[in-house]
Amino acid sequence: MYFTNITGGEPFIRTDLNDIVRELYKKSDRIVISTNGFFTDRIIALAKEFPQIGIRISIEGLEQTNNEIRGLNDGFNRGYTTLKKLREMGMTDVGFGMTVQDKNAPDLVPLYQLSNKMGMEFATASLHNSFYFVEAKNIIHDRPMVAKNFEALINELLKSNSPKKWFRAYFNHGLINYIYGQPRLLPCDMSFDTFFIDPYGDVMPCNGTKDKEVMGNLNVQSWDELWHSEQAEAVRNKVRHCTRNCWMIGSVSPAMHKYIAKPALWVLKHKAKSLLGLKYSMYENPICCDYRDGKVSKADLDKLSTCDMNAMVNNGLSANSNAALQGKRGEDIVNADVESQGYEATKRDSSSKLGY
């Protein structure tokens, strides 16, 4: 495999993560771990053993915004401090990951500028609904405002001297297209050349489907048996007809490499315009013009999203697990685990301030 992303939940809650990474490096050329950055000492220890590893710390805006969204006491400080320590160690494949929504869109460019100042990567996403996120009601309410902030980020990326950032500008252009509920700019080939494995051995095309679509299970099948099974082919057929139009880096990055002509032409055109002092506009997306001009309504766009206010999401937990959750928040269970490992439990409020 050329790339593996380890995500969660929070991967560093697992005390055997180093063992998992060690095994994965026997099969994968590159590994990136997505984390909230809370377990600084564990992250540093893993980075010392695997200095080539990538670390993306989820930070949902500047300090106040991040801590409000994530509900982690001192969450921004912990993530920021972890990133600084990783850079001081000489690690290069580290950076921020931000999921953009109404609450944090105004922080998008300031957070990018902070990451740029620190010489770090900056990854973006927007709200999605799926079985994996145990969510069906995520939706962008003020699309023009959020799109305007993506527009500003795109122009910042195009001004850089980094071709990698120019292609990230294209990815963010696709996020504007996504939040307006439009068809993907590039085909989705999940389950054909990319896949998702959960902690229980179930192999799925991705983590963006409405319901859990299982191709097979590695605890009872060999990889070749699973990959070429009738069940896997049935799931691929669903992917061929999927209308969710997700735009997440896990599916888009392989597509950008596979169908390079379209993003490359976009990049060449818009970098040339940037050099001439001309800026990218969100209104290059026809749907943005249609909404501005009253040709489509907010209700029309809401219908195009994957948001379903009446949906009952199956969280995939067993009856025993659901019983254990009665009367508790997920955070309460995580806090109990965190405290059992000698860490301070998180709180919902934060009075800390960070100068940067």
Regions found by a protein language model. Name each.
Residues 44, 67, 247:
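A short local structural element in Rossmann-fold oxidoreductases
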Residues 1-7, 237-245, 273-296:
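Short Fe-S-cluster ligation motifs
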Residues 259-269:
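Short cysteine/histidine-rich metal-coordination sites, predominantly Zn2+-binding motifs
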Residues 1-61:
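Conserved SAM/AdoMet-binding glycine-rich loop
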Residues 23, 27-29, 49, 53-60, ...:
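Radical SAM enzyme [4Fe-4S]-AdoMet core and its adjacent flexible, acidic
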Residues 209-253:
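Membrane-interface junctions of multi-pass transporters
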Residues 6, 34, 96-97, 125, ...:
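Residue-level detector of family-conserved "landmark" positions at structurally sensitive sites
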Residues 207, 255-260:
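Short conserved micro-motifs at the rims of enzyme active sites and ligand-binding pockets
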